[in-house]
Amino acid sequence: MSWLLGYMDPTEPSFVAAVITIVFNPLFWNVVARWEQRTRKLSRAFGSPHLACYSLGICILLLNILRSHCFTQAMMSQPKMEGLDNHTTYFLGLAFLGWGFVFVLSSFYALGFTGTFLGDYFGILKESRVTTFPFSVLDNPMYWGSTANYLGWALMHASPTGLLLTVLVAIVYVVALLYEEPFTAEIYRQKATRLHKRS
């Protein structure tokens, strides 16, 4: 990892902005979602849990667009690595990008808008946890697909800065999952218990 640092200036403003957006985004949506789950204040403010969830989802989408922009600007402002600047690496990056898009888009299709954007924190639950593709082949495919997108983008640009930022994306997602996965498992366990009692 240390060899990457020789190709970048960590004080460069666009790099700092990329780091901030990468760390902030999952922190923001987890804090807001937990707050909503405890207080239901967003649902009351917007008049319904669905409208509140849609509003948070739009905020998350806009933040993710900003994160991707900052990521790209950080790569463009730092030098390329000659050893990565070749056709093989470019097409490898393209493959990762394609793989990432497949997992992100298929996850969105399987979960729907509210399932993707934390609807369970708003009390909007599916009949059961989704286990169809891509969840049948990979846990948390939305997060790992997103990480693959950033990795592919970094490789296509022969960017050591992009590779380092991709590692940060992966670390932040792993930390987020430490909070998200137990919650999701628990709410569906509670739902199954309630349904069992009714039957």
Curated annotation (Swiss-Prot):
Protein name: Phosphatidylethanolamine N-methyltransferase
Expressed in which tissues: Expressed in liver (at protein level).
Gene: Pemt
Transmembrane spans: 46-66, 94-114, 158-178
Species: Mus musculus
Protein's job: Catalyzes the three sequential steps of the methylation pathway for the biosynthesis of phosphatidylcholine, a critical and essential component for membrane structure.
Organism lineage string: Eukaryota, Metazoa, Chordata, Craniata, Vertebrata
Pfam family, one: PEMT
Lumenal side: 1-12, 34-45, 115-157
Recorded coiled-coil stretches: none
